[in-house]
Design a protein with these regions (language model features):
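N-terminal active-site segment of His-dependent metallophosphoesterases
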Residues: 5-65, 162
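Extended active-site neighborhood of metal-dependent phosphoesterases/phosphodiesterases
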Residues: 59-158, 196, 203, 217-248
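Bacterial N-terminal signal peptides
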Residues: 1-3
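A short, flexible beta-alpha/helix-coil linker loop
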Residues: 54-57, 139-142, 180-183
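Active-site neighborhood of phospho(di)ester-bond hydrolases with catalytic His/Asp-centered motifs
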Residues: 19-22, 47-53, 81-87, 175-178, ...
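Residue-level signal for short, function-critical loop segments
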Residues: 23, 88, 138, 179, ...
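His/acidic metal-ligating clusters that form di-metal
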Residues: 10-11, 38-47, 76-77, 126, ...
Length: 251
C-alpha cells in the first residue's frame, strides 16, 4: 500500500542507511527477514534502523522473552551498525495479557541496549552532517492513560529539543520512532509531540525528517509544513528502504 509521493532510492554508491519496521510477525516473515538481512549485508550502509514492533503483541511473540531472544540472535546477523527502536508490541501493549509494561520495557532494554539503563533506547549520532535521534514513542495512542506516559514524554520532548539545537548548525535532523503521530483518536496521546514537530518544521523548514512505522502504510509526504515524513513498510510486507545519508534538496 502506498500513500503520498514516494521518492526513488538513492543510486548505488551514494552513502546511505537502511530502515525497516513492523516485522517479523510470523515464521514466514522470519524467513523473509533473514533474506532481507542478506540483501542489506551485501550493500554498503552506514547503519540500519528498525523502528520497532518486532512481533505481534501476543505472549508467544513480542510480549514473551523467547521471541525477543530469537530476534536478538537474528539481528546480530546484520553486519552494519544496528539500532532498534522499541515498539508498542514489545512493551506498552502487553497490558492486554496482564503484564506490567514498564517491566517489559526493562526487559527490552536488557536485551537490545548496548548499555542497559533508563532511557538507553534514546540514541543520537551524527552522520552525513545530519543529526539522527531515536525516540521511545509507541503506537496505540502512546500508552495514554498509564502513569508512565507523562514522565517518558517529558524525557522524549527534552531529548528531541536538545537534538534539534544540535541540528540547527548541521544539514538537518532525522527522527526515528515507532508511532504514527498523525493517526489520532478522540483522546490524543500525540498532541504535544505533534505540536513540537510542527514547531520544528517552522524553525527548520525542509530540514526535518520523521521516519516511523506503526500503521504499515508506505508513505513519503509532508503532513506538516516543513516536515518530511517517511513511513516504512510493515507486516505482511518484509521490505526495507535505502535512504541517503545527506539531506535531500528542499522538496
Amino acid at each position: 500500500m502506498l500513500a503520498g509521493c514516494a521518492s526513488a532510492p538513492p543510486p548505488e554508491g551514494t552513502p546511505a542507511f537502511g530502515v525497516l519496521g513492523d516485522t517479523p510477525y510470523s515464521m514466514r516473515e522470519v524467513g523473509e527477514l533473514d533474506r532481507l538481512i542478506d540483501e542489506m549485508n551485501a550493500q554498503e550502509l552506514a547503519f540500519v534502523v528498525h523502528v520497532g514492533d518486532i512481533g505481534t503483541s501476543s505472549l508467544a511473540q513480542a510480549c514473551g522473552d523467547a521471541w525477543l531472544l530469537e530476534r536478538q540472535k537474528q539481528f546480530a546477523r546484520i553486519r552494519h551498525r544496528f539500532i532498534l527502536v522499541p515498539g508498542d508490541n514489545e512493551w506498552s501493549d502487553c497490558t492486554r495479557h496482564g503484564l506490567d509494561p514498564v517491566a517489559r520495557l526493562r526487559k527490552w532494554r536488557e536485551l537490545f541496549c548496548e548499555s542497559p539503563g533508563e532511557w538507553c533506547e534514546h540514541q543520537r549520532w551524527e552522520t552525513g552532517d545530519r543529526v539522527f535521534v531515536t525516540l521511545n514513542v509507541p503506537g496505540n495512542n502512546n500508552n495514554r492513560g498509564h502513569p508512565e506516559m507523562g514522565p517518558r514524554m517529558q524525557v522524549v520532548e527534552r531529548w528531541l529539543e536538545e537534538s534539534a539545537r544540535l541540528a540547527e548548525s548541521r544539514d538537518g535532523l532525522v527522527i526515528l520512532m515507532q508511532a504514527n503521530p498523525f493517526e489520532t483518536l478522540r483522546r490524543d496521546g500525540y498532541e504535544s509531540l505533534r505540536a513540537q514537530l510542527a514547531a520544528l518544521g517552522r524553525r527548520m523548514p525542509g530540514r526535518v525528517t520523521l521516519i516511523h512505522g506503526d500503521t504499515h502504510l508506505l508513505r513519503d509526504d509532508e503532513p506538516l509544513p516543513g516536515l518530511r515524513r517517511i513511513e516504512v513498510w510493515g507486516s505482511p510486507f518484509v521490505r526495507w528502504r535505502r535512504e541517503p545519508l545527506s539531506a535531500p534538496p528542499n522538496r
